[in-house]
């Protein structure tokens, strides 16, 4: 709570004003699932940051806990969704809480049928705003997909 003095209100006199609900740096919670500690130490990033009930998830890719890229596209896509599920869960959310999602695809048109099939198996349909972007490359050679999202805990 922040106090602001100095408001002179006609008929009332000098009034102190309190501002409620302001967000401070202490309201931010860094979310790191147990299985991602090595990645966070290696890459120096937070898988998610939670402010209030809103969870901002960094891009998740299909790699093993040992940071190896999974070569098979379908298995890589499944692993990316599983990594996102772990991040959401560590932040108190689930797929149904996602309100916005952006996916980045290398060789998008070649892999889109497989990606959509996997997405439809694991992610609820029509529950969020989704933007799909084709890119030339991602952080590591062999990565085909990165998924980032924003979720609001219900």
Where are the regions a protein language model picked out?
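Acidic, Ala/Val/Gly-enriched low-complexity intrinsically disordered segments
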Residues: 5-7, 12-15
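N-terminal presequence-like segments and the immediate start of the first folded domain
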Residues: 13-82, 86-99, 105-154
């Amino acid at each position: 709570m922040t106090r602001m003095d100095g408001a002179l209100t006609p008929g009332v006199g000098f009034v102190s004003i309190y501002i409620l609900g302001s967000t401070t740096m202490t309201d931010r919670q860094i979310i790191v699932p147990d299985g991602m500690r090595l990645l966070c130490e290696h890459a120096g990033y937070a898988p998610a940051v939670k402010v209030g009930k809103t969870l901002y998830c960094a891009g998740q890719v299909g790699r093993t806990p040992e940071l190896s890229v999974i070569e098979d596209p379908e298995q890589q896509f499944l692993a990316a969704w599983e990594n996102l599920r772990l991040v959401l869960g560590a932040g108190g959310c689930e797929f149904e809480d996602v309100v916005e999602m952006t996916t980045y695809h290398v060789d998008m048109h070649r892999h889109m049928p497989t990606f959509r099939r996997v997405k439809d198996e694991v992610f609820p349909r029509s529950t969020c705003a989704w933007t799909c972007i084709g890119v030339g490359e991602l952080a590591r050679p062999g990565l085909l997909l990165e998924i980032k999202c924003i979720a609001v805990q219900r």
